[in-house]
């Protein structure tokens, strides 16, 4: 079984020392979904929401969240991200929005948490902007789709 890297020999939480690790190109992709009523989704698609462009706001929120992940997740390292991409796709056939994020850097630690945080905060932003018209929207699942680079190797979800 793989050891938990954020727990020291005494069983205490600590930030992992990455100073001896090699810098490599690292990338991670994540996704999140927001399920809603067809009328709520139509309002987003048509751009008729009274608060403005829901997708543009969620995209910016996701990008900002990726950049601030280290402030939200206690043991994450502050990272110099070279790329943050947030794509939003209305899926009327499922009455939902799909969010896919991609984060990249050249560094000593991975960007999985940044990609997951970007997807999560973009989903929360959609909820926040639309809660006045629908409070029972469902967020989820949120998951890591892929990661590459680093000592632990590559990972990709089987779709």
Curated annotation (Swiss-Prot):
Binding site for substrate: 75-77, 113-114
An individual GO BP term: Mo-molybdopterin cofactor biosynthetic process
Origin: domain of life: Bacteria
Top EC category: lyase
Pfam family, one: MoaC
Residues annotated as signal peptide: none
Keywords from the named record: Lyase, Molybdenum cofactor biosynthesis
Catalytic activity: (8S)-3',8-cyclo-7,8-dihydroguanosine 5'-triphosphate = cyclic pyranopterin phosphate + diphosphate
Lyase in keyword set: yes
Active site location: 128
Record EC number: 4.6.1.17
Function: Catalyzes the conversion of (8S)-3',8-cyclo-7,8-dihydroguanosine 5'-triphosphate to cyclic pyranopterin monophosphate (cPMP).
Protein family: Belongs to the MoaC family.
Name of the protein described by the UniProt record: Cyclic pyranopterin monophosphate synthase
Species annotation: Serratia proteamaculans (strain 568)
């Amino acid at each position: 079984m793989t050891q938990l890297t954020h727990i020291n020999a005494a069983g205490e939480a600590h930030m992992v020392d990455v100073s001896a690790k090699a810098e490599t190109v690292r990338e991670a992709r994540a996704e999140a979904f927001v399920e809603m009523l067809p009328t709520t989704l139509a309002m987003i698609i048509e751009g008729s929401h009274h608060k403005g462009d829901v997708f543009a706001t969620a995209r910016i929120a996701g990008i900002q969240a990726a950049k601030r992940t280290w402030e939200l997740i206690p043991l994450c390292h502050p990272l110099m991200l070279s790329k943050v991409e947030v794509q939003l796709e209305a899926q009327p056939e499922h009455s939902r929005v799909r969010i896919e994020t991609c984060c990249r850097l050249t560094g000593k630690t991975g960007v999985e948490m940044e990609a997951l945080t970007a997807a999560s905060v973009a989903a929360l932003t959609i909820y926040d902007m639309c809660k006045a018209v629908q409070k029972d929207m469902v967020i989820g699942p949120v998951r890591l789709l892929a990661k590459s680079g680093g000592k632990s190797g590559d990972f990709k979800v089987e779709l």
